[in-house]
Amino acid sequence: MGKLLADKLGKLANKPVVGDVDIEDDRVFEHRESGSDSDMDSGDEELKKAHYAQVGESKLRKQLDSEKNLQELDTKYVGSVGSREDIYGENASSGSDSGSDSELEDDESDAPANDLQSNDESESVESESEESDHESGSESDNGEVLRKIVEKETRQAMNRISDLTKRDASKGYSILSQNKFFENILDTRIKLQKAMNSANVLPVTKASWKLELKEDSENKKLLEENLSMVENLLNRVINFRIDIQAKEGISTDSKLETSKKRDITDLNESTDALDKDLKKYRTAVLQKWSAKVSSASGSSAMKSSKFKAVNQSADAQVENQLADTPRLIKRTCLNRRNVLPINFTEDMEQGRLTKFESTSNTGENNDEDENADIPKNYDPRRKDNNAIDISTNPYIFDDGDFYRVLLNDLIDKKTSSANLGVTSSATNSAIIVSKSNYKLKKNVDTKASKGRKLNYSIQEPIANYEAPVSSGYKWSDEQIDEFFAGLLGQKINFNEDSEQDSESDVGDEEEAIKNDDIQIFA
């Protein structure tokens, strides 16, 4: 039952001026607190900016006001044009649906009250269901678009990462293959070391070869077999080099043929031609990678160290090392193992070794006046000092210093890999580590610097030598008297001649007294 007009008027008349508010209800004061906070914040901001000077807009902001200027400045700030249907999908049709719903509501407003109430309830239920359907559809469409964008970006990132990993993997594989190839070459060089040492013992002259071949008939047969095998090996090496240089695009001489049978002179000529072609390619490759490494490490930017040998290009370092060819050849002629070829002394005595005589003559002319009392061929470090100086022998080949450097590099490399746990054999790694530690260990006394300790060396005892033992030699009385007189600052005359003269004078005087014919009797 509806309220009467009198009741409504009484309620309005009795309404208090100040409304009754529940102080425990937080929702009542939310709008008031937010309003007061906003007023306080705005007041604080105005107080903070009260001392600011009025400044107009900058030129850059004015230029960026228009989209045209923005496009002219940089294209990366311009977005792509799109439609709402691409983003929201079916949300665009929701507006038309809502418009039709409002029209239906206006038409149905003239219906009776009961029908209107029932229609309102049914329409509210339908509108709620439709809105929920539209919201779920729009959310699903937005999620689909975002999912596609994320998938696209992840696909691009994975492709980029896969390209980088493939590039890094190819670089690592090439480095591993190069290291493996170098280790194979070094292994071959190690196996050839014994053969090179044995080759230095072979006879030098033809006369010595004839003498050795006469003693044993099998030597001639073995020598011919070895010569044929060496020639075959050299031919295969030349053919391999020709194929490799042709495959790598290195310009080779057209006269060189892979199927040609060559003798010793042809082998030397082919080797020289291949080395000449390879030198240009080697220089270009060294320059390229040297420049890349220096630019990556930043060593080229240091002006103070650019003239050092280490910071120069790799090809310049190689050329500097190969510039002094006579010195390098002389180093290969050093007899580090004291090898003496067969019948070498006989060949030297008979004057068959022309190279050895020329080098010895030049050395004698240079050291003509130095140490004339010491023999020319004497060396105190050698156990046997023969008449022939074999410290430098032009008829041998010994590159022990270079071979030692290669071995040290190999040991260091294996040591580092052993420390990282890469080696497969534990025993080999332990041996290599022990060798490297022995190599790096130095017997240095750290307390012997700045004169804090006397440096001395102990002389080794001489073998098969016994020093003479003194048989109690003593001083004479005269030496003892002279020693003590010298300590006291006195002088004693020990001249025997003067004493004899004085004694003879005394004797003559006594004889003269006896023979004066005057006798005195007591």
Curated annotation (Swiss-Prot):
Biased segments, Basic and acidic residues type: 26-35, 58-75, 376-385, 512-522
Pfam family membership, one: TRAUB
Superkingdom of origin: Eukaryota
Sequence ranges of Acidic residues compositional bias: 100-110, 118-133, 496-511
Keyword set, alphabetical order: Coiled coil, Nucleus
GO terms, biological process: maturation of SSU-rRNA from tricistronic rRNA transcript (SSU-rRNA, 5.8S rRNA, LSU-rRNA)
Cystine pairings recorded for this chain: none
A cellular component term, taken from the record's GO annotations: nucleolus
Main location: nucleus
Compartments (UniProt record): Nucleus, Nucleolus
Region span, Disordered: 26-145, 356-385, 496-522
Residue ranges that the Swiss-Prot or TrEMBL entry lists as coiled coil: 205-282
Family: Belongs to the AATF family.
Designated name of the protein: Protein BFR2
